[in-house]
């Protein structure tokens, strides 16, 4: 989860999020090198008299500043496309979870099981237990197994919403009349928090998401208690 005055991303808890962090660092380093070069050239122009007022043509320079940006864009595009394909690829899922957005709560349905569905509202501050987070805790957590591919089917009953878990690298819009799909696979157990990330009305800020990722054995025990 995020902490006050935190500048970086949340700790990655899925292979996709790890790839996104690597891509962020890769792109940031390229931006840093370009910015350093531009600042160096600006400082050089301000502190020296290396100007060529009589130069009318410089094909070598024009060739360099055409090819170099193209190479840089390719270096950014290739890993970006790789991650996009990874996020879109869904192998045979072990579990399917259907998520519906409402004003202003989420409803979940485990489509592989009969009658396993529930609504998830933000827990009011008066009901919070010690250690639970204000505005982020819910009355019904989503429990899922770790280290297994899970297919998320996401839609909305009313307006646009967005189902987002930053530490898992998942952000999918919930659009009325459309069923969007996402992949989720957690690499370690834990409790992961998210929120609706699309302004959806007066109580948009009060649509938290809580995932409880547990080992498969504990997930099976939870299933038996719910069915």
Curated annotation (Swiss-Prot):
Its cofactor is Cu cation. GO terms for cellular component: mitochondrial inner membrane; respiratory chain complex IV. It comes from Eulemur macaco. This is Cytochrome c oxidase subunit 2. It holds the Pfam family COX2_TM. Disulfide bonds: none annotated. Residues 46-59 are mitochondrial matrix. The gene is MT-CO2. It is a multi-pass membrane protein. SUPFAM superfamilies: Cupredoxins, Cytochrome c oxidase subunit II-like, transmembrane region. It catalyses: 4 Fe(II)-[cytochrome c] + O2 + 8 H(+)(in) = 4 Fe(III)-[cytochrome c] + 2 H2O + 4 H(+)(out). Its main location: mitochondrion.
């Amino acid at each position: 989860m995020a902490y006050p005055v935190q500048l970086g991303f949340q700790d990655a808890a899925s292979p996709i999020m790890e790839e996104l962090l690597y891509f962020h660092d890769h792109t940031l380093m390229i931006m840093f090198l370009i910015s350093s070069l531009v600042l160096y050239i600006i400082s050089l122009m301000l502190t020296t008299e290396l100007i060529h007022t009589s130069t009318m043509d410089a094909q070598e320079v024009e060739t360099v500043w055409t090819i170099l940006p193209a190479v840089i864009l390719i270096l950014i595009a290739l890993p970006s496309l790789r991650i996009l394909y990874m996020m879109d690829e869904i192998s045979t899922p072990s579990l399917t979870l259907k998520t519906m957005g409402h004003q202003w709560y989420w409803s979940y349905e485990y489509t592989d099981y009969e009658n396993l569905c529930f609504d998830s509202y933000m827990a009011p501050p008066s009901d919070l237990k010690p250690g639970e987070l204000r505005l982020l805790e819910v009355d019904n957590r989503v429990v899922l197994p770790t280290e297994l591919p899970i297919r998320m089917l996401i839609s909305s009953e009313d307006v646009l919403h967005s189902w987002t878990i930053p530490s898992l690298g998942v952000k999918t819009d919930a659009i009325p009349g459309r069923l969007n799909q996402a992949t989720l696979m957690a690499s370690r157990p834990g409790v992961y928090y998210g929120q609706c990330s699309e302004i959806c009305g007066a109580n948009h800020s009060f649509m938290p998401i809580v995932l409880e990722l547990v080992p498969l054995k504990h997930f099976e025990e939870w299933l038996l208690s719910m069915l």
